[in-house]
């Protein structure tokens, strides 16, 4: 899918996901039907998602960690996809540097770090080592509720 200037402007306007397609169309000088069609296409292509986000530190009993993973083999994409489907994983990214993958993981009172390592990560073969970074305070962090 080609991302043009109109698509970028649509994405910017949808920062407020409750905004009407009509008001966006009026601002961008395009038709409401064009907005609707383009947003549908952006969603189908996994370029855009419209969802409620929250600050994990604002909800009692919730926190987030960042986990660096070193793999024993260089099957980065395959392992990234596999790990991204584990419970609590907000995102898994293939990175440069001392880790092969970096994860953002969400926890609550019923599902914590111990459960993540014993019930989820332990299922994944080919992990050489992990390092966990507990997020004490974050700025501008908003994530989807996935638990």
What residue spans do the PLM features occupy?
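A compositional/biophysical signature of low hydrophobicity enriched in polar/charged and small residues
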Residues: 1-147
């Amino acid at each position: 899918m080609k991302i043009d200037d109109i698509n970028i402007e649509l994405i910017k306007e949808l920062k407020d996901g409750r905004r009407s397609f009509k008001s966006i169309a009026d601002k961008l000088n395009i038709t409401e039907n064009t907005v609707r069609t383009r947003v549908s296409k952006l969603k189908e292509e996994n370029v855009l998602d419209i969802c409620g986000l929250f600050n994990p530190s604002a909800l009692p009993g919730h926190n987030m960690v960042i986990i660096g993973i070193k793999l024993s083999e260089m099957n980065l994409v395959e392992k990234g996809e596999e790990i991204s489907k584990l419970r609590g994983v907000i995102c898994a990214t293939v990175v440069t540097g001392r880790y092969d993958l970096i994860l953002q993981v969400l926890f609550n009172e019923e599902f914590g770090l111990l459960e993540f390592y014993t019930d989820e990560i332990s299922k994944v073969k080919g992990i050489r080592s992990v390092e966990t970074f507990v997020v004490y305070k974050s700025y501008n962090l908003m994530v989807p509720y996935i638990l």
